[in-house]
Every structure is written in C-alpha cells, then in structure tokens.
Amino acid sequence: MRIFYLLIFLNTLVLSVLAQKNTRGKVVDQDENPIPFVKVQEPETGNVCYTNDQGEFVLNYFESDSKLTFTTSGYDTLRLALPYDKYTTVFMSAKENTNPYHMGFMVGFLDFKNKNKNKNLENMTYFLGESDINRQLQMLPGIEQGTEGYSNLFVRGGEVDQNLMLYNGTPIYNSNHIFGLSSVFHQRSIANTGISRGMSSAKYGGRLSSTISLESSKTGSYSGVKGELEITPINAGIYIESIKKDLSYFTLSARRSWIDLLIPAESRQQSVNANIYDYQIGYGKYLKNGDKLDFSFMNTRDLYFVSLQTTDTANGNIPITYGITQKWYNVLASVNYTEQVTSQLKRVHSIHYSSYKNKNDYSQETYDFNLLENPLVEEKLQRGIRDIGLKTDWEYAFSNEHHLSFGWQNTFRQFLLGANNLISKNYPNQSDIDTIVGNPNYQTSIESSFYGEDKYFFSKDVTLDAGLRATIYSFDGYTKLVAEPRFHLTYFLQNNDVFKAAYNRHNQFVNQLNLGRSGSPDNIWVPATGEILPQNSDILEIGYERKLGRQFSGTVNAYYKNMQNLSAVSNLNDASNPEKDWKSSVVQGSGKSYGLEFMFQKSKGDFTGWVSYAYSKSVRTFPDLYANEFLFTFDRPHMLKVYGNYTNEYSIWNFSFNYLVGSGQLFTLPIGKFRDINGQLQLEYNTLNNYRSPLYQRLDISAGRKNINSS
C-alpha cells in the first residue's frame, strides 16, 4: 500500500511539473537560420532562459500581460509579447552595418564552442577553386593542417583520429578526397559548422580532441525550388533544394571530378584513371502534431588506377602488364524523429549507419602466346570500419533555473582489420592459388553510453553546466566501464564581458594506426583491447570574451590537456601486414599539450575578418620508442593567422585573403653515423622530431565577381 501511495505522489508531482505554464519557440534570423544563446527574459519578474543550439527556448512562469526581451550579440534587441503554450518563431534583425557575408566564427557565450553559418563560404580563398569546410576550420587558433596543402585537422596537439566529425549526427571515418588535399563535404550542402576543441557537452563522447558538427541545410523562408551549378578546376557540382515552408524539404548536392572525362575511354580502362565523387541527399517532413522526421544520406568515393606495360627480355620479350588500383569510400545514412512530448519536454530518436572501406588491388598479367590463358597474379587487400548507432536524446526545461538533457546511445562498431585475397592462376606446372590471408570477417565492439546534464542558471550572471557521461565498452572478452564528468562555468561581468572555466574528461575506444602519414586512406582503424587500452584525456580551460565597441570582439583562451594510453606504430611493415597481429606492432604512451590562444574579429562594415595567434606546446612520452620525452610531430609553438574579406550585398566584386605564418614542421634527422662491430654503417639519433624546418608562411589571395539581378 505504501508503494501505491508513493506512486500516486510521484505521478502527481510529475504531472504538476509538466503542467507548468510556459511559452516556447524558436529564435531565427531573417533567413530563418537558428540563433543560439539568445537571452530571453521577462523584465517584470527577472525570469530568464537562453536558446539552445537549434535556437529553441522554453520560459516558465510566464505572465501573459508582459513582454519578453530577446538580446544577443550582433542583433537588435527585440521586445515581444508571446502567448501561453504555443510554439512561436521569433525573427531577429542584425544590427546596422552588420555584413551578411562575414565569415567569422561566433564564439559561444555559454560554452567553448565555435559556430559558423556557411552561407558565404564561397567568399573565402580556397584551394584550386574548391570551397572547403576543413580549410575554414584550419583558420581557427589551435587547429593545424599538419603537412602543407592537406585538409587534415590537428586540434590542440591531438591526432586526426581524435576528432569526432559528425554529418547530421552521423560519424564519418574518412573526410578526405585526393589523399587529404580536399574534404568530402560540398560546401553548398552544409548550412552550419560547429566545433568544440575538447570542451563538449556530456551528449558527445568517444574522441579526445574535438567534436565537429556539420549540419545540412534543412529550412527556408520560402516555398519553391532553386538550384545551382558550379565548375572548378577539380570538380563540377550541382545543388538543388525544394522547400515547402513548414511542410517538408528536399536537398540534393553532388560533385564529380571532370578532368578524367577528357581522357579517352580506352585509356581510362587500360592505362590511367583517377576520379572522385560525393553526393548528399536530405529529406524532412513536418508532421501534423508538430513532430518532425528527417532522413540524410551521403556517399563519397575516390578511385585511382595505373597500368604499366613492360617486357620480360629474359624469357623471349614476353609482355607483362602491372596494374595498381586504389579505391576508398564512405556511406552514411541516418533517420531522426523529433517528438515534442509536452511544451517542456522534447526527445529525438535516431538511428544511423556509417561505413568506410579502403581497397588496394595489385595485378600482374603475363601475355605468353604459347599458353591458352595468360598467367595472372592478383592481390586484393581490404580494410574498413562500420557502425550502427541507436540513440534517444531528451531535453527537459524543468524550470527557468534548470534545463536538463539526458539520453542513451548504443554503437555497434565493426572492424575489418585486413583481408588480403591472393590469386595465382594459369601458370604452367603450378596449381592455381586462391586464398585469403588475414581475417575476412568483421570483429564487433559494443559501446553503450548514458549521459545527463543540467544547465543550472544560478543567477542572471552565473551559469553552470554540470554533466556526467558513463560508457560501457566491450570487445572480444574485454570490458571497460568509464565515467566522464563535464563542468562548464560561465560568469557574465557587468560590462557584458564573459569569463568561462571548464573541465572535461574524455575516453576513446578506437584508434587509427598511421602507416606513414596521418589522414592517409591506408591507415587502419582498430579497437581498444585488453592489450591496447582505451585512450583518455583530462582537459582544463579558461576563457575570456569581450565586445569591443559595435564592430569588434576579442577572445582569450588558455588550456591544458593530459593524455594517457596514446598509441603509436613501432613497426610499419608488421602493422601493415594482415598476416601478423597488429597489436604486436603498437606501443602506448602518454602526452600533454598546453597553450594560449587569442582571436580578434571585425564583423561589421564592408571589410571583415579576424586575426588569431596561438602559442602552444605538445609533447609525447613513449618509453618503448624513446626513453625521454619528445615533441609531437605536429607541434608548432607559434602560429599567426589573418583572414580578411571585402564585399557587400551591392558590390559585384569580392576580395579576400588568408595569411599564415608560424613555426615550421618537425622531422627526425640523424646527428651522425658510425660503423658497428660488423662493419655496417649505422645512423645516430639523439631524439625523435629533433629538427624544425624554417619559418612557415603562406598567402592566399582571391577575387571573385558575381552577377546581380537588378529586376
């Protein structure tokens, strides 16, 4: 009976909380792009809340005869009366002289996230005419490209595989075309980009360095169809969107390289061929009850083929053809169902699929006219990774002081560590061979996470995000339970300056073995095991942001990151050989990085841009590689980045430039040589990464002309 009364009490309590009066809605700009971190306040009572990343808000205990104020940096303050229990779209106007073509990143006042609308990414200088999301991110302090010309992302002393890159919530395992010279994302299909450089909410996990969120265009302030065609020195592309306002949307984005089409078809099949493509499809429908269904699909592929002919003079000038083919591709798909349970409670159910596979084929065919069939040798090596994810995320506006988010996430991840199909046939006096070396079967790991987070508004000046993420990981009999606390404190000073401090802990249960170069398609994704332990990191960061007049803003950030169980390859030949156990070629160590970052932006007027400077240091300790601590390969203590853009909505010309100057890249060079007791010449090294190349500088300048329709 006591249990019965207790259940009645709890049910009454829950219903009373859910029945609180409130007003809710979404804050957008004039193009209906969501505006995050807008302060929504009821002046009469002091009740206040902030919009989330989707621009949505819920304000409780609302007095029907009062007006709400909407304030945020860069937009005119708005006062508006809103009705009870209705979802209202609130439009805000940018302040006078704000340049809509500004490419600057908006810094989050309530967290450490940098966000940007990609509407005018084409105004930025770019490589061979290709607007590139990754190169845009490389212009932020603390994010480096590594090797010159590549679109890799090394965030605050971390490796490429330590970035969680999400396309509409689905992880992508290789984001590069052309061996890293270009990213796989068509800039026109990406509406918003957000990056958290280590400080992310409890909702995200599984990587040490960053969370990068790429969202495709899903809304529009009109009903109709529009499209774009483009051609660059690399690709030809098309973008189509069909929008029925408040009902549904459909988007299609596709690119393909075109230079190979100039080569005769016979040559492409027999001698040389290289092409890339990617396409993205999005569809969404708004249901009658206010719920929403979204579908997203993405496919990318690179293909490179070379065939060489030679003559075996030792055996009667017999022609021999050698062929090398490399192909890698991504396939991503996701379905999201957004459900508004009550005016205060929203949940999103999601399922996603992500697959990456790399194939390397080698063939040797001998044209011996004395034989009925040509002798043939082939090697077909495959490696890859794929996962299926299920998750449910809840957002609950419990009160104006407490905004809760919680949920669970399940990922079934499968690894193809290396399967080499060896074929030999049609050789005289030899039996045909068709065998597989390595393991052709996928090996499965399971990663289950539960998280909860409370955005607690102590007062109008102080906000605390306190979260906890717990993950259970299992693979091949190895099980690990980890807890990841997340704390973000925000303090608004009287002059609207912002001070922030945060602590995050992260764990990573996948590693990418670098077989020569970070970001290469040949690198192998491997699971954490009982021998190769999961990576983890602890990160501390403080930040200060200030508005400088109406046109300028500045930020300063300092961070310290400690990393454990980092992985490195000790023997490249054994690690790349599918016949051998990859774990025997991997050693683990630790690392740390720290730095100080400055960023100064101008967002208004015809000329906009930013200047950033970062001082940083990143070191590694791998006792099995070298006894002492050494610098991380992509450690660059000093880096200055300048971006400028001159344009306005009436000008037919756009001018922009990027300038980077900083410390050179590290290499390992011998300091001497000697002969051992057997008389063999040996090289002497004093440490790893002991030589730094000269000062690095790069300047990119672009000018563009656009047609303006005066009708």
Q: Where are the regions that the model predicts?
A:
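Outer membrane beta-barrel strand-and-loop segments of large Gram-negative receptors
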Residues: 383, 387-391, 438-444, 449, ...
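Periplasm-facing N-terminal accessory domains of Gram-negative outer-membrane beta-barrel systems
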Residues: 18-100, 145
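Conserved C-terminal beta-signal and adjacent last beta-strands/turns
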Residues: 241, 284, 632-711
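Periplasmic N-terminal accessory/gating domains of Gram-negative outer-membrane beta-barrel systems
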Residues: 109-163, 169-200, 217
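Surface-exposed extracellular loop regions of Gram-negative outer-membrane beta-barrel proteins
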Residues: 309-314, 422, 495-539, 560-583, ...
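Gram-negative outer-membrane beta-barrel transporters
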Residues: 560-562, 580, 584-671
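Short, acidic, small-residue-rich periplasmic hinge/interaction motif at the N-terminus
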Residues: 41-43, 71-75, 83-125, 134-135, ...
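Face-selective signature of the C-terminal outer-membrane beta-barrel domain
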Residues: 281-303, 324-478, 492, 552-560, ...
